[in-house]
Amino acid sequence: MNPISAAAVKALRDRTNAPMMDCKAALTEANGDMEKAIDILRKKHSAIQAKKGERETAEGRIAAYIDSTKLVGAIVEMRCESAPVAKSEPFVKLANDIAKQVALKNPPTVQDLLAQPFVDNPKHTVNDRIAEVVALIRENMKVARFSRHTGQLGSYCHHDGSVGVLVLVEGRADPDLLKDVSMHITAKNPVAARREDVPPDLIDREKEIARTQALATGKPANIVDKIAEGKMKTWFAESVLLEQPFVKDDSKTVGDLLKGAGLKLVGYVRYKVGELSS
């Protein structure tokens, strides 16, 4: 057979993102046939992915995608093995691709997601897309979780991908305002959206702590009750989203901000890398 040209190797790399040496070896094995070489690489990528599949994935990043025309969005947590890879361009793009896939194709489970035709290249599956990056970087990677929603959405992901938020409201919303609210949730990590959404056992625990602290002052019982009540009011203001002072303007609460914009909070999803065991 004729020698494999550098142009052919580059063309195969452009189509698969596989390392140059792997591309050359695949083209050699396929006698220069580009499509056969792609199949060879896909099989090799799957084999590499399987070998690395048992390695711990303690690092990763959060990615979000919103289609404002279709009023649909998703947030995902992608896992990998090391912090440098979590910040690498191929992994960042992969996480963004998976968020887009979830938003547009609505898979019910991670397994269904992996089996779907990849939205940007339907000839391959989502699992094939992940396997390409695994083969390129040589680390185990996986989709840890995702959440998809429809409606008026906003999102924000921290620059290092460690934390991200997807927020859903009712009403005509300014995208920048929803981004700001999402950023606030990322930074302040509220325990719930509203006071009535806080788990009762958590409220009971905080009340007990507040009363114990109040009793330690040695004040009369009626004063103790007022001190404990004040401590709980402070705790709710620090812990409940709509009662928290807005991070960019603490003269108003997040609830005031949304109400002033004619918006009603429906809910939010906040992901942090590593919250779930890998």
Where are these regions (language model features)?
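N-terminal assembly/interaction segments in proteins that build large macromolecular machines
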Residues: 2-278
